[in-house]
Amino acid sequence: MAEIIKSVISNVLTAFYQPFWFALLLAALFMLAYKAYPSAKDAARRWVEWFKTDSSFRKIFLLAFYTALILFRTLLNRNIWANPLSDVMGKWWLYTPDGKLTTEMIENFLLFMPFTAILFWCFRDKLLGGWVTFFKTLWCAVKTVFLFSFTIEMLQLVLRLGTWQLSDLFYNILGGAVGGIIYFIAYKIKHIKK
């Protein structure tokens, strides 16, 4: 009987804990919108108007949307781990030592590639300044993705959501660097045509 009660309590607390951070974030954003526009109809009308007319609004919306996808994948929708340091090295190849296929390295690589390109697209002047060079773009991409990814890994460690892994950090940074290179190439092509 004690095991059943323990299991029920554990399952109920886990069911509330898993969506807690997402619910908190969503509630905070809702309250900001509510205080700015108490009328839902007016808020929706203004949002659609901004989306149609303001390109920077669309860019930042895309960045916020993609950042939310990353956070939901890495932090907000994770199970609690008893030992977040159980696999510090992580997975470095497509197959685990027992021969099972894993796509973690590909997911981590692809997760940050668009993020960096979108981030530079939104904040090029603030991040890269007026003169965009290859090494400046690459360094800024690596530095930014390292800080963001390291923060996610540390939050996974502290909050016990997932495992802290060096391979995640490496492939996130590699994906971010490739995203920075893709942004640089697109930027140069766009400015050569002008």
Regions picked out by a protein language model, each given a short descriptive name:
Residues 1-161, 166, 177-194:
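Bulky hydrophobic segments
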